[in-house]
Amino acid sequence: MNYFRPLYPFLLGWALILNTTSFANLSLVNGLGQLILFSAVVCIPIWRTGRMSYVDIGWPWGLVLLGIVSFFLSDGYWLRSLVVSIVLILVGLRMGLGALKMWQMGLLKKEFPRYQYQRIRWEKEGKTNVALALQVDAISQGLANASFLAIPIFIIASNNSPEFLVLEIIGLVIWLLAFAMETVADLQKIAFLQQMKKAGKQRQVCNVGLWRYCRHPNYFAEWMVWN
């Protein structure tokens, strides 16, 4: 059983960027930073607790790191680099601060359902060394930030043109609308949960605001953010 197979595409992607003349320095700094971040924030806690949920802290803060690195080390037009960095940092902070809040509330002491399902998948694949599979999955998340997620960021941030294309402006507008939508959806759900808690009600369906029209408006908006 090859436990390390999930890492191969990301390692290949990172190696390809490292071998480019334009992005080698960016990729090296970002990749090493991601590995250090994930080792401290994700891999060690997973090793100590056996729970995968710490990925929800490491991955968004990896986006923040990617945004900072791309701004300070890219050779593109400063305003374009700044815009790209701000977009990444805001996306990362939204999820990263939320994850820290969940950790503070003790919610990470229980494995999230999606990670419980991951264990079922491993069992079906014949993977019996769960501790190793957890570490490989966690590292793959950090390598994603170092490879395929970083490629479009580096390309855009390294564009020297001082003029913004119409397509870039359209993309920024879509991002602003989507980011606002998922923020509003999150706030509406938090308010709903607080109201249900005060009323002593449990397992209620959120059907207020944007949640009236879509089962997961925050997920839909998050998908649009990455478009």
Could you describe each region identified by the protein language model?
Residues 1-215, 220-227:
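Membrane-anchoring alpha-helices and their flanking helix-loop junctions
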